[in-house]
Swiss-Prot record:
Residue runs in coiled coils: 32-85, 158-208, 541-573, 952-989, 1398-1491
Protein name per the record: Formin-E
Gene encoding the protein: forE
Function: Formins play an important role in the nucleation of actin and the formation of linear actin filaments.
GO molecular function, a single term: profilin binding
Length: 1561
């Protein structure tokens, strides 16, 4: 019995020292050495005592038999109350039977030891009463979630009472012997332990918690008190566990006293471990109900899991002496010494491995596999690596040639940003550096030595109840199943296996388990009763009972196998790896590894990796601790000190292992608000991208998306990311995707308005400019697609059509659609972006059609043309009159008038601002309750650009008006030219000399085209003084239009005096009066009227030309001499205000005098400004020498139009008679010089022809050549002839049996009438049918337009203009020849180079005339070839028929191609939709089968459902494919009936005229 005492006392001391050592890992090496020396001393005492026990082993045979009998009796009682748990496997039974003999020997020794014990062995002893009470209240404590902790004093008293009862049964001699030997040493050790504890408290600054005592009891009355089994458990990696169970003659309760100490957070391998007594209480509080529903076989499996996690043989676990230490419960025989030593080593190794498991994944290892001293610290050795492999840590791909790192040993690749985290993870190649005694067994994991691992009590199991249920069958592999622990057959430990039965007598166990950190399960851990070992071979009665239990177990296993077969292995989550106590079989490891590679999107060579290496990778993947996976951990970390590693860990959790309960807890703890606050306010750039990634993963979960939808600040915060320079392009693209999801009203109610408001309040002038720049600047088509998806969803989600049009117009003004049309031609290979562009165009076309319908309805309802200002004003006036708002309308109009009168820029800005304000008010539907609803701050943004646009449009309008005026003048000149050509033709046809009237008529028309030359002298017949005429250089008369014509007659005499009225007044000074009719045209004279005494107001009438007066009504009027008007009264009533002008003239300084016509003088001044520093006389020299280097063609043309008239020359003559020439303006002086230049007009004409002949020929020749070539191309085109044949057959078939059928030919214009014949359903026409035939039967005809390249130019040529130009060139050359002849006859000097020029020009004109005639002949042949009338058809009309036919043909080809592409896209969409529906059905079927399989196996709310995988990705895929738009296409489309049903109210409210948007639910 002394042996027992000597082995028990050190056990308690060892447990105390191990408890201290668990916390003293933070102390200096000095404290550790003192503790180690104390443990060595205890170990020596235990070894000596074991030797004495072996000698007395044979004496104690008789008590062993009694103990065995009592055990059988107890087992029978247990079988009567409750069904025993079936024995596990036959292999275990054989192992246990072999151990029974050894266990019996050990039990005998322990019984002797207890009899001689006289004093408490440990500081915590539990007597029978406390054990009984604790056992009775165990279930109540589990329900109340409280674990009772007896006070230390009460425990000591109970232990003392228990020891006193044991003294009566044991031998006094053994008790006294043990007492005397150990008492002294115990007191010394206690003092050392107290000192160490005090020092630990001082260093750690926290009190050592009271030990947790867990006692399991049964409701049945206990048998007589046996000697207790005391187990002291500690979590220190250097402490030992000593257990001394004793078998008494009667089976007695064996309480398990377990001590657990609060741990302190410590970084080991990058992992933070922290488990306190409160954590264990929380874990064990809510498991009572879970354990109730667990079947017996599952409870058996739970016990197996606990046993596999515990040490097979508790013993000394000090790594410093594990090679020599012995187990206290070892046999006294010498034959078992070696086995005990091995057990000691195994226990030590097992403890170390369990400690390492706290940093890994709570994976248990066999105790004989690893030599603790041979385990070094072995981490990754990363080298720079170039490649595109995925990161093992975060799962993201790297860009080509970007920096990544690869482990030299295991080949794992990680990003630079994940390098710090990966350096804390042990390398998988550590398997090659681990040295164990048993190499045949597989080493399942590795962790660095000296890692702090805190152990939990043995009754705590990390496996979920549902997980345990699925793990009892051995035939079906499961991630959650734990195979039975492999213990040494020679290991004599009493707690290897037992039956956990709540109705059985008290069951105890001294097991050691390691705290696990489960990723998948955050629910409270289950509590299971640890088993005890059978200490004697079973009796025949017991064997019969065990067989019955085995049969029941087999039936239950079969039921479980059927349930597990219904569940798919693929749905097993990799996070349940932490629930596995030992390494599963190879097939399960391969399945887990393949699933992990798929989740991480990696392509590691699985065939090259061994099963052990795969298992190590799985361990590294799920290395996180349980407390690091809790939402509270991340919330506290984000609040206190956020870092890049925290965000990366959170992203991993959210991406792979998040559950509904986890997400609910995260949301309830305001985790979403914290993320947005960090994203908004933090100035750190290193983790902002990771923070945005966390938000994206949160939104991928329905619970997280709902939480984000309730945050008003979310859209604004994400919008800031777009314009911030702190984020990369990838993060901005993610922000665009998140905003796209927020726009979907179905998932984020009201999100569209929040996003739009956030974009409006940005500092940019144009709120959507970022998205347009994002599309234009980025070359990636994927990024373009994301931005365009946002734009389409934004426009689509707007219910009001006016708002949609307004938003779309903003994008159009930014140039979005122009860019989209350009890239649409080059991105046909990118179907997604092409689809988004088509959706943008479809929505735009639909809104345009709907707007047109509304406008038409509005016109019909109002009965006015809304484009007419007068009609709109009348309707508005009538509406305001009925409403009594006339005064307000008048005030608005008056204010508009004031704006225009006060502002010098005609109030452009104000009118634009008013237009914008009224437009926004008309679109506003919210009422006037809240004035803040009106947003006027952004109105001034586009005011400057709009003003510039209006100003530019005004200038463009003026220029267009000028161009129209010039075009009209040119047209009038063309008419005059044609008239002259007709006259010339008449003269040629007649062959006789024309009479004088005809010559005068021609001269008059020439004068109208060009200013006439000035006369030699002009007299004023009405001048009373009859002054001498102005003498200038003699100007010969103009050359005759034809040879042989007489010179023109002199000017007509002055008008006749007389008549009833007074004589006409003299002309004003310096003027010749009103212009008289030209000399060449005779018409009746104007009526005689008296001269007013002062200027009168002008009468704005239009003067008829003399040619038009003849043969008109005015030519047949009477003499009109009898009309005597009240001349004086008219002068008084219509007098002009000339007095004011006289006063201004007096004040005004006197400038140069201008005599000629003001308009002519202004034009001459502008022309002379081009020749700065050149005198007017020098210009005459340029004309005389025909120097083209001095004067250009345009300048010569201008100077030909600026010749002074005869009236101007006469006025200048009169002025020079009275005043000096220096007083005249420069324009007047120029007119004097040019008038004195002989033959000025003729020489200018010669110069003009020489300068512009080449350009005129170059303009006409290509047009003639284009028509000529086009005739040849059409005539020789075989494909065109084939097309005409096919159409002839098609037409006869269509018109068969009608008068239009059965024909042999048709007119060419029938080609363009093919599109007029529509199909029955109006979806196609005859040209489409023809194109389809060509595509299928004769595809070579599709390129017939390539044979007609000149057709485009020929159809644009105006043939009549070409003919006129050729004739004009010929006349001009002939006219210049006549001028040269006249100058030669008059001996007038001129430039002789003109003679050579005329010779060359005549040759060119002759060639041009021949080319024209040849082309006309070819065209006549072509018309005859196609059965067209020669005289009626012009070339431009003929070729235009073919051009229009080509356009129709190409349009039909494009339309058919688009229809084909649309059909293919629609088929692809339907196929994708069908595939998604099939996947949804499969998911639903799988979930239903899983739910209907068994109520115990139904999917809990804590499991990760398939529907919650990634909702954001699914929504974006629907948007990209276009399904989101097409499915809801009819949701908001307002019909024509709705628009017409809205009647116009009296106040013309636009909200009542136009359909209102439906309210969103």
């Amino acid at each position: 019995m002394d042996n027992h005492s000597s082995s028990s006392n050190p056990s308690s001391l060892s447990s105390s020292s191990s408890s201290s050592s668990s916390s003293s890992s933070f102390l200096s090496d000095h404290v550790k050495k003192e503790e180690q020396n104390g443990l060595d001393t205890i170990k020596e005492e235990i070894e000596n005592k074991i030797e004495n026990e072996e000698e007395e082993e044979k004496i104690e045979e008789k008590p062993i038999e009694k103990v065995e009998e009592e055990k059988i009796i107890v087992q029978k009682e247990e079988e009567e109350k409750i069904e025993e748990e079936p024995i596990e496997k036959e292999e275990e039974k054989k192992v246990e039977e072999e151990k029974f003999e050894q266990d019996n020997i050990n039990t005998t020794v322990e019984a002797k030891t207890l009899e001689t014990s006289t004093e408490p062995i440990a500081t915590e002893v539990v007597d029978e009463k406390s054990i009984t009470s604790n056992n009775e209240n165990l279930e109540e404590q589990q329900k109340e979630d409280v674990i009772s902790i007896p006070p230390p004093q009460q425990e000591q008293q109970e232990q003392q009472e228990q020891q006193e009862k044991q003294k009566e049964e044991t031998k006094p001699s053994i008790r006294e012997e043990v007492k005397e030997k150990i008492k002294g040493k115990l007191s010394e050790i206690k003092e050392e332990i107290k000192d160490i504890k005090e020092e630990i408290k001082h260093v750690i600054r926290e009190e050592v918690t009271e030990p947790i005592i867990v006692v399991e009891n049964n409701n049945s009355p206990p048998p007589p008190p046996p000697p207790p089994s005391i187990t002291v458990q500690s979590s220190s990696p250097v402490s030992s566990q000593i257990s001394s169970p004793v078998s008494s003659p009667v089976s007695s309760p064996k309480p398990s006293v377990t001590f657990n100490e609060d741990g302190r957070k410590r970084k080991e391998g990058g992992i933070t471990a922290s488990i306190s007594s409160e954590d264990i209480m929380a874990l064990s509080s809510s498991t009572s109900t879970n354990n109730k529903g667990i079947p017996k076989e599952n409870k058996r499996t739970a016990s197996t899991i606990l046993r596999s996690k515990s040490s097979p043989n508790p013993g000394a676990n000090n790594p410093n002496h594990n090679k020599d230490g012995n187990n206290s419960s070892s046999s006294s025989s010498s034959n078992n010494n070696s086995d005990n030593n091995n057990n000691s080593d195994n226990n030590s190794n097992n403890n170390n491995i369990n400690n390492n498991n706290s940093s890994s994944n709570n994976l248990n290892y066999d105790s004989s596999d690893i030599d603790t001293e041979a385990i070094p610290k072995f981490y990754h050795d990363f080298k720079i690596h170039r490649g595109t492999s995925s990161c093992v840590y975060c799962g993201e791909n790297t860009r080509l040639w970007s920096t990544s790192y690869k482990c030299f040993f295991c080949g794992v690749v990680c990003h630079k940003k994940c390098l710090d985290s990966m350096n804390t993870i042990p390398c998988s190649s550590a398997i090659h550096n681990i040295k164990g005694k048993n190499r045949s067994q597989t080493i399942s994991g590795y962790a660095p030595p000296n890692s702090l691992a805190l152990q939990a009590p043995p009754y705590i199991s990390v496996a979920k109840p549902s997980s345990i249920t699925n793990s009892s069958s051995k035939s079906t592999p499961s991630l959650l199943s734990a195979p039975p622990s492999q213990s040494n057959s020679n290991n004599s430990s009493p707690n290897i296996s037992s039956k956990s039965n709540p109705n059985s007598p008290i069951t105890t166990s001294a097991t050691t388990t390691t705290t696990t950190a489960t990723i998948s399960s955050l629910s409270p851990t289950s509590i299971s009763s640890p088993p005890i070992a059978s200490e004697q071979p079973p009796s025949p009665l017991l064997q019969q009972q065990q067989q019955q239990q085995q049969q029941q177990q087999q039936q239950q296993q079969q039921q479980q196998q059927q349930q597990q077969q219904q569940q798919q292995i693929s749905t097993t989550q990799l996070q349940d790896l932490n629930n596995t106590s030992e390494k599963p079989d190879d097939d399960m490891i391969n399945l887990m590894f393949d699933t992990l590679m798929v989740d991480l999107d990696l392509n590691l060579p699985a065939s090259k990796l061994s099963t052990t290496q795969k298992w190590l990778l799985l361990e590294q993947k799920f290395k996180l601790k349980k407390d690091e996976l809790l939402p509270e951990y991340f919330i506290n970390a984000l609040k206190e000190q956020p870092s890049k590693s925290i965000f990366q860990s959170l992203v991993v959790i959210l991406r792979t292992n998040v559950t509904k309960n986890w997400m609910c807890s995260f949301v309830q703890l305001n985790g979403v608000e914290i993320l947005f606050e960090i994203l908004s306010k933090s100035k750190r750039k290193d983790y902002k991208d990771d923070c945005l990634s966390c938000i994206g993963k949160v939104m991928s979960n329905p619970i997280g998306l709902n939480s984000v939808a309730q945050l008003p600040m979310a859209p604004k915060t994400i919008t800031k990311v777009l314009r911030s320079k702190q984020y990369c392009i990838k993060s901005k693209a993610m922000a665009i995707e998140l905003l796209t999801v927020m726009l979907l009203d179905k998932y984020v109610p009201g999100g569209c308005s929040l996003v739009l408001k956030a974009l409006t309040k940005t500092k940019e002038k144009k709120r959507f400019s970022f998205f347009v720049r994002f599309i234009k600047d980025n070359e990636s088509l994927e990024l373009k697609t994301k931005a365009l998806c946002f734009i389409n969803v934004l426009i689509f989600e707007m219910e009001d059509m006016n708002v949609r049009v307004n938003i779309r117009s903003e994008f159009l003004r930014l140039g979005l659609y122009t860019y989209l049309r350009e890239i649409k031609k080059t991105i046909t290979h990118e179907k997604t972006l092409f689809t988004q562009i088509e959706i943008f165009e479809e929505m735009m076309n639909e809104d345009t059609q709907e707007l047109d319908l509304r406008l038409e309805d509005l016109k019909r309802q109002l009965g006015i043309d809304i484009d007419d200002v007068d009609q709109v004003f009348k309707a508005l006036k009538n509406t305001t009159s009925k409403s009594g708002l006339n005064r307000q309308l008048l005030n608005i109009l008056q204010n508009l008038l004031v704006i225009k009168a006060c502002d010098p820029t005609d109030g452009v800005k104000y009118f634009i601002l008013c237009d914008t304000l009224v437009k926004q008010i008309s679109l506003h539907k919210g009422g006037f309750e809240d004035p803040s609803n009106f947003d006027f701050r952004g109105l001034m943004v586009g005011l400057e650009s709009a003003t510039a646009e209006v100003t530019l449009n005004r200038k463009l309008g003026e220029l267009e008006k000028q161009n129209i005026d010039k075009a009209m003048k040119i047209q009038e000149q063309d008419i005059n030219i044609k008239s002259l050509l007709d006259l010339l033709k008449q003269l040629k046809d007649g062959g006789t000399a024309p009479d004088a009237s005809m010559i005068k008529k021609i001269e008059e028309m020439i004068k109208q085209m060009e200013p006439p030359p000035p006369p030699i002298s002009v007299k004023s017949p009405d001048d009373p003084n009859n002054a001498a005429p102005i003498v200038v250089a003699p100007i010969p008369p103009p050359p005759p239009p034809i040879s042989g014509a007489p010179p023109p007659p002199p000017p007509p005499p002055p008008p006749m005096k007389g008549g009833a009225g007074p004589p006409p007044p003299p002309p004003p000074p310096g003027k010749l009066g009103a212009k008289k009719p030209p000399a060449g045209v005779q018409c009746r004279p104007p009526p005689k009227v008296p001269k007013p005494s002062h200027p009168l107001k002008a009468y704005q009438w239009v003067k008829l030309a003399p040619v038009k007066v003849n043969d008109s009504l005015f030519d047949k009027l009477g003499p009109m001499n009898d009309i005597n008007l009240p001349w004086n009264q008219i002068e008084e009533e219509f007098a002009a205000k000339v007095i004011v002008r006289e006063k201004k003239a007096i004040v005004k300084p006197k400038g140069p005098t201008q005599v000629i016509d003001p308009k002519l003088g202004q034009n001459i001044s502008i022309f002379l400004s081009q020749f700065k520093g050149v005198e007017p006389k020098q210009l005459i020299t340029y004309i005389q020498s025909m120097d083209e280097s001095k004067m250009s063609r345009d300048q010569v043309k201008q100077i030909s139009k600026l010749l002074p008239s005869r009236e101007d020359l006469a006025a200048l003559k009169e002025f020079l008679q009275a005043e000096d020439r220096s007083k005249l303006s420069i324009a007047d002086q120029y007119c004097i010089d040019i008038g004195a230049f002989p033959f000025a007009s003729e020489k200018i004409s010669m110069f003009l022809l020489k300068s512009e002949l080449k350009s005129r020929l170059d303009e006409v020749k290509p047009q003639i050549a284009a028509v000529s070539v086009a005739c040849d191309e059409v005539y020789k085109s075989k494909k065109l002839i084939r097309i005409i044949e096919i159409i002839l057959v098609l037409g006869n078939f269509i018109n068969y049996g009608t008068p239009r059928g059965d024909i042999s030919g048709y007119k060419l214009d029938s080609l363009i009438k093919l599109s007029d014949t529509k199909s029955s359903d109006l979806s196609s026409n005859l040209i489409n049918t023809f194109v389809k035939y060509c595509q299928e039967k004769e595809p070579n005809l599709l390129t017939f337009a390539d044979e007609l390249p000149s057709l485009t130019t020929a159809r644009k040529t105006i043939w009549s203009g070409v003919v006129a130009d050729v004739s004009s060139i010929g006349r001009d050359v002939h006219s210049v020849k006549q001028i040269v002849e006249t100058l030669q006859k008059s001996n007038e000097p001129f430039n002789q180079s003109i003679i050579d020029f005329l010779a060359t020009a005549s040759t060119e004109v002759e060639k041009l005339r021949k080319l024209l005639e040849s082309t006309q002949e070819n065209f006549k042949k072509l018309c005859k070839y196609f059965a067209e009338e020669e005289g009626k058809s012009q070339p431009e009309e003929f070729f235009d028929i073919f051009g229009r036919f080509i356009t129709l043909f190409e349009n039909a080809t494009t339309q058919l191609q688009q229809q084909k592409e649309e059909q293919l896209k629609e088929e692809k969409r339907l196929q994708q939709k069908q595939q998604r529906q099939e996947r949804a059905v499969r998911k639903l079927t799988t979930s239903n089968e899983s739910a209907s399989a068994s109520p115990n196996h139904a999917k809990s709310t804590d499991d990760k459902s398939d529907e919650d995988d990634d909702i954001v990705n699914d929504l974006l895929m629907a948007v990209r494919d276009g399904d989101a738009f097409r499915q809801a296409k009819g949701r908001r489309r307002t019909t024509h009936q709705i628009a017409t049903s809205k009647m116009i109210s009296n106040n013309l409210d636009p909200s009542k005229i136009l359909p209102t948007s439906p309210n969103k639910n």
